Structures are given as structure tokens and as C-alpha cells.
Amino acid sequence: YGPNELPAEEGKNAESAIEALKEYEPEMGKEIVPGDLVEISVGDKIPADLRIDQSILTGESVSVIKNILFSGTNVAAGKTQMAETEEIKTPLQQKVGEATETALIVLGEKEFTLEFSRVIVITGDNKKAEIGIAMGSGTAVAK
């Protein structure tokens, strides 16, 4: 046999071993949809951006959402179930988008800029609240 060749029997064994290992492969991010629960444990590669709910650990009846685990990172310790996250626009962001389109139609030959800032604040009861701040400015273009 050459240096890069295996006997037929050993080659078949290696192929079947690789096929068996594929069964342990984690779900790929493209197969996971928002809301799916993903179980991860030590050594697993995070298949998608996930949000942590620690209420099962603390015994609280209401979900306690923590920071995100990012796709491609690895689990160093522990085991948990996490939910897939999705970046969605808030109703205010959707309205700002509609207002921008309307403003561009109405203003026609005028230059219009709309800046939107999203600010996250912590309320008195330790919950997050989003505040949207929109600032617009326009300039008329002389013909």
C-alpha cells in the first residue's frame, strides 16, 4: 500500500465511523427557526444566536431573559436549553420607516434626512423598555 492508501476493509470502517459521527453533529443555524428550543452542553458549538432563560435555575415562575449566546461560539461549562432569537422591528421602527417613505414622496425635490436612535432603559421593576427617538431635518433645493 502507498502512504495515503488504506486497505479496503479499513477504508470501509473509516467511512462507517465518519457516518456514525455525523449523527452527533449539531443542528445547523439555517435549520433552526425563531422560537425553537436548542439543547446545548459542554463542548457544543452554538448553532445560532440564542437567548438564555435562567428561570429554571432560579425557580422563578416568570422567564428571566439574559444575554445572547452567539452562533459559532462554544459552550465552556454547563448544559441548558435556549430559544432561537430573531431581530424584528419595533412598531415605532416600522412607523418611522413608513414616515420616511411618506416624507420622501411629499418632499419630492427636497433633501430630507431622518435619523432614528434606539435607547434601551431599565425601568424601576428591572425590566427593559425601548424608547425611540426620531430627529428629522430637511433642506429645500432651489431650481
Curated annotation (Swiss-Prot):
Task: Please give the GO cellular component terms listed in this UniProt entry.
Answer: sarcoplasmic reticulum membrane
**Superkingdom assignment:** Eukaryota
Q: Which InterPro entries match?
A: ATPase_P-typ_transduc_dom_A_sf
Alphabetized, the UniProt keywords read: Allergen, Calcium, Calcium transport, Endoplasmic reticulum, Ion transport, Membrane, Metal-binding, Sarcoplasmic reticulum, Translocase, Transmembrane, Transport
Question: Carries keyword Transmembrane?
Answer: yes
Q: Which reaction does it catalyse?
A: Ca(2+)(in) + ATP + H2O = Ca(2+)(out) + ADP + phosphate + H(+)
Cited Pfam families: E1-E2_ATPase (PF00122)
Localization per record: Endoplasmic reticulum membrane; Sarcoplasmic reticulum membrane
Which GO molecular function terms does the record list? Answer: metal ion binding; P-type calcium transporter activity
EC number assigned by the record: 7.2.2.10
Its membrane topology is listed as:
Multi-pass membrane protein
User: Principal localization?
Assistant: endoplasmic reticulum
- The cysteines covalently paired via disulfide bonds are none
EC top class, as a word: translocase
Which Gene3D superfamilies does the UniProt record give?
Calcium-transporting ATPase, cytoplasmic transduction domain A
- Record's function text: This magnesium-dependent enzyme catalyzes the hydrolysis of ATP coupled with the transport of calcium. Transports calcium ions from the cytosol into the sarcoplasmic/endoplasmic reticulum lumen. Contributes to calcium sequestration involved in muscular excitation/contraction.
Q: Which PANTHER family match?
A: CALCIUM-TRANSPORTING ATPASE
Family in the record = Belongs to the cation transport ATPase (P-type) (TC 3.A.3) family. Type IIA subfamily.
User: What name does UniProt use for this protein?
Assistant: Sarcoplasmic/endoplasmic reticulum calcium ATPase
